[in-house]
Amino acid sequence: MSDFDEFERQLNENKQERDKENRHRKRSHSRSRSRDRKRRSRSRDRRNRDQRSASRDRRRRSKPLTRGAKEEHGGLIRSPRHEKKKKVRKYWDVPPPGFEHITPMQYKAMQAAGQIPATALLPTMTPDGLAVTPTPVPVVGSQMTRQARRLYVGNIPFGITEEAMMDFFNAQMRLGGLTQAPGNPVLAVQINQDKNFAFLEFRSVDETTQAMAFDGIIFQGQSLKIRRPHDYQPLPGMSENPSVYVPGVVSTVVPDSAHKLFIGGLPNYLNDDQVKELLTSFGPLKAFNLVKDSATGLSKGYAFCEYVDINVTDQAIAGLNGMQLGDKKLLVQRASVGAKNATLVSPPSTINQTPVTLQVPGLMSSQVQMGGHPTEVLCLMNMVLPEELLDDEEYEEIVEDVRDECSKYGLVKSIEIPRPVDGVEVPGCGKIFVEFTSVFDCQKAMQGLTGRKFANRVVVTKYCDPDSYHRRDFW
């Protein structure tokens, strides 16, 4: 190999080595620049985070701390909350929950009767001096007044619907001005088509009482019979009778008053219209009730009434008492007269010779015999209805009540209260017979019980023949 060739080979090797070194330096420089870019990027990220953190700190410092945490002495403490105090209602003239439909006087009467705990809804004072009313007692609610907000309606038209009944009574209440607030006073109607009666539920106790003024109103040709339900318990201090009179409506309930008349000795064949015609010859009637046998529907021979104009009461007594109707003579007097003016006959040895007598108001120096010839058996009338004797428990309660009261006048030997039987005409059903051990005790009981009230009805009494009583001949 010539020297030239050798020289050229060395040049090529040197060139290859330089190229190799150059490539190595380029790769190293590229990696270095990449690392530099990454370092610069991380540095920018740190600066951005620091800036955001500083910005948050500035925002925190720029507004007051209401909640959250702040750094103090190396610990975290809660900043106090600043909230607006709630306004406490004083409940001035605001009815308690569940009593929206009764008046304040009714509420006070219920509270006085112990139906509402006296301290149950009294406001208590907080340390800040605010009155706070506690949660009402769970038992307090409209259910407590429900029985006082319901009415029984009998003799309803056949096939009548609940909607029609509700519309009729709501309209009558509005026309009569008996509603206490806008809206319908009748909330619900329940009809028993088989037994031809219904129950109405009103929104308030007062409106329920005023609706009783429609007793006897004509609805689709039927005279409605309106009564309180059997479970009714009067509210203390509240009137049980309506304070209004609906013109043209003759109530079938004659409330107790000084102007309530008893008409006895009516022939059994006379119907309501015939007796009314006789009575209205002295003036229009406010209320009238001809007592009938529930089994036969026939008159029992006596009735009660009250006139619209109370001034004609004495005139009716003077004109009707002693009037001959067929083979009977009328006995007309105030219904409560027996309890006040009956004279106790004594001593016992003269009982059979001296009948109980009373002075009838409105008659000129005349006396009428009360209750017939005295015996040991007393008949109490107008105290119970046949349907009230169906339930065994209720029947036993009535017997016990009668026994307890009659025992105050003497020793009670026996009591008979005939009960209704389906499909059978039971003699004396609706009457109560009490046998005493002596005539004298029976007389005392008559004088003490005549004109008294039993189940909100005025008691009428008469003597019963002992032999008929023992034969159970209660006709």
From Swiss-Prot:
Region (Disordered): 1-90
Phosphoserine found at: S2, S79, S294
Statement: the UniProt record of this protein carries the keyword DNA-binding: no
GO biological process: mRNA processing; mRNA splicing, via spliceosome; negative regulation of mRNA splicing, via spliceosome; negative regulation of protein ubiquitination; positive regulation of RNA splicing; spliceosomal complex assembly
Any one cellular-component term (Gene Ontology): nucleus
5-hydroxylysine modification, residue list: K15, K276
Task of the protein: Plays a role in pre-mRNA splicing and 3'-end processing. By recruiting PRPF19 and the PRP19C/Prp19 complex/NTC/Nineteen complex to the RNA polymerase II C-terminal domain (CTD), and thereby pre-mRNA, may couple transcription to splicing. Induces cardiac troponin-T (TNNT2) pre-mRNA exon inclusion in muscle. Regulates the TNNT2 exon 5 inclusion through competition with MBNL1. Binds preferentially to a single-stranded structure within the polypyrimidine tract of TNNT2 intron 4 during spliceosome assembly.
Subunit structure and binding partners: Interacts with U2AF1L4. Heterodimer with U2AF1. Binds unphosphorylated SF1. Interacts with SCAF11 and SNW1. Interacts with ZRSR2/U2AF1-RS2. Interacts with RBM17. Interacts with PRPF19; the interaction is direct. Interacts with POLR2A (via the C-terminal domain); recruits PRPF19 and the Prp19 complex to the pre-mRNA. Interacts with KHDC4 (Isoform 2). Interacts with ZRSR2. Interacts with the SF3B complex composed of SF3B1, SF3B2, SF3B3, SF3B4, SF3B5, SF3B6 and PHF5A.
Record's protein name: Splicing factor U2AF 65 kDa subunit
Organism (species): Homo sapiens (Human)
Lineage of origin: Eukaryota, Metazoa, Chordata, Craniata, Vertebrata
Gene that encodes it: U2AF2
